[in-house]
Structures are given as C-alpha cells and as structure tokens.
Amino acid sequence: MAFMKKYLLPILGLFMAYYYYSANEEFRPEMLQGKKVIVTGASKGIGREMAYHLAKMGAHVVVTARSKETLQKVVSHCLELGAASAHYIAGTMEDMTFAEQFVAQAGKLMGGLDMLILNHITNTSLNLFHDDIHHVRKSMEVNFLSYVVLTVAALPMLKQSNGSIVVVSSLAGKVAYPMVAAYSASKFALDGFFSSIRKEYSVSRVNVSITLCVLGLIDTETAMKAVSGIVHMQAAPKEECALEIIKGGALRQEEVYYDSSLWTTLLIRNPCRKILEFLYSTSYNMDRFINK
C-alpha cells in the first residue's frame, strides 16, 4: 500500500493527465504542402481518399496497388486536385522484392521521402477458421511482413527528413473478433512490431515518428461487401477517416482511433498499457545496443 501511494498512484495520475489532456499542435493542411509521401493500397477505398486529400494539400505523392489502370486514374485526379507531383508504381505486396524496390523507385521519383503511409491488405472474407494455413501465411506476409520490408527500405530516407511512418491497422488488431482470425493476427502483429520499434527509436534518438491508426468499420466498397448480411453496425465515412489518418501522421501522434462509435474510442484507449510499458522500460539497459 505504501508503494502504491508513493510511486504507482502519482505515476498513474501523470499518465492519465497526459493521455487525456495533453494538447497536440493543431493540424494545418499546409503541413503537407511540398511533402513527399508514399501511399500503399491507393487504388480504392481509404488509400485513394488519402491520396486525394494529400493532393489537395499540395503534396508530392507516389501511390501503389496492383491495378495499373486504376492507379493511372488516381494519379490523373491527384494532379487535377493540385498535387505538387503524382506518380504510380503498380505491383503486388506479396512480392517482397517488389516492396523493397518500390520504395527506392518512389524516393527517386520524389527526391526523398517525408511520410510512408502503409495501408494495403490482402483480400479477406469473413469466415470461421478451420485449417486454411495458406490464408494465414498470406495474410501475415502481405498485411504484416511487407510493412516491415517497406519500413526498412524507407528508413534511411525518413531519417534524413525526420519523417513519419503511418500504419493503418484495425480494431481487430486490438480486440478479438470472430471470423477474421488471420486478418486479426496480422493486425495484432503490426501493433506489437511498430509499438516496439517506436520505443527503440525514442531511446536511440531516431527522429522518425510512428502513428498506428486503429480503425473501426469504414464504408469502403470492399468492407461493405465483406460484412453484408453478417455484421450489423454503422460504418464511418472513408473520406473523413482518410483525413484523420493524415492528420495523425502530420501531428506525429502515437495512435489514431477512428470509428463511428465514441464508446469504442473511449474503451479501447488503454492508459494502463502505457504505464506498464514505462515501468518495464526502466528495467532495460540499452546503452550497449545504442552505442555500437
């Protein structure tokens, strides 16, 4: 009890105050003007809407997805909206060699990189899991491993620009849902990996921010088709969702929550996790790794 009064309760109070009352810098569209941004999974849905928002803000954008024809239309519209420049590189994130080469090509097209927005996923349908190991492997490779490959390839440029990594995830990566086991596993993996390296970047003074975006049901065509007749809940608008993701990345927030339900946002935020992470971090001696 004495320990709680002396240490734990004050720490809890500080974290609660920080978590709920700390004010971020107000977002301004000009924060993205002239910035060099990659958006993956940008041929439709949230990715396409992010590309359009960035174009309106005057950013340089390079988009990628599998469909060359659709990407051509996205790039054309980005230029109409006022993008400083817009390019596409078509390919599949099932191919890790493509993922690595894509970043290098995008950086060359823009002359550097300020923000990497990781948004692509493999096709997912709602179903009970039985024995489809192939689908689990594919989900982990596309939804998780390719994100790591892209991040590793982009990091040298992001270090030079003090840039940002924006990781689009899901409530299914924070809370267990039925019928999405493989998808959920890949999204939980994103949280574990990127939250861990965020701590490492902080300790080793790597000035690259990582924003994890935790999304609920969004009214994209793909999502609406997948949940039709199965899930009965209100979907949030993809246009507004895309803007909130960009805002979170520009403001270098650790996490962005976007969902149609206020209660979801309130319940999913977990200050106790932050306290545990802080307490555990004090037990590590990382100097031997940082000073190599």
Curated annotation (Swiss-Prot):
Coiled-coil region(s): none
Major location (coarse): endoplasmic reticulum
SUPFAM superfamilies per record: NAD(P)-binding Rossmann-fold domains
Residues given in the record as NADP(+) binding sites: 41-67, 92-93, 119-121, 183-187, 218-222
GO molecular function: 11-beta-hydroxysteroid dehydrogenase (NADP+) activity; 7-beta-hydroxysteroid dehydrogenase (NADP+) activity; cortisol dehydrogenase (NAD+) activity; NADP binding; protein homodimerization activity; steroid binding
Modifications the protein undergoes after translation, according to the UniProt entry: Glycosylated.
Highest rank taxon of the organism: Eukaryota
Reaction(s) this enzyme catalyzes, per UniProt: an 11beta-hydroxysteroid + NADP(+) = an 11-oxosteroid + NADPH + H(+); cortisone + NADPH + H(+) = cortisol + NADP(+); corticosterone + NADP(+) = 11-dehydrocorticosterone + NADPH + H(+); a 7beta-hydroxysteroid + NADP(+) = a 7-oxosteroid + NADPH + H(+)
Alphabetized InterPro entries for the sequence: 11-beta-HSD (IPR051253), NAD(P)-bd_dom_sf (IPR036291), Sc_DH/Rdtase_CS (IPR020904), SDR_fam (IPR002347)
Gene3D superfamilies from the UniProt entry: NAD(P)-binding Rossmann-like Domain
A single BP term in Gene Ontology: lung development
Protein name in the entry: 11-beta-hydroxysteroid dehydrogenase 1
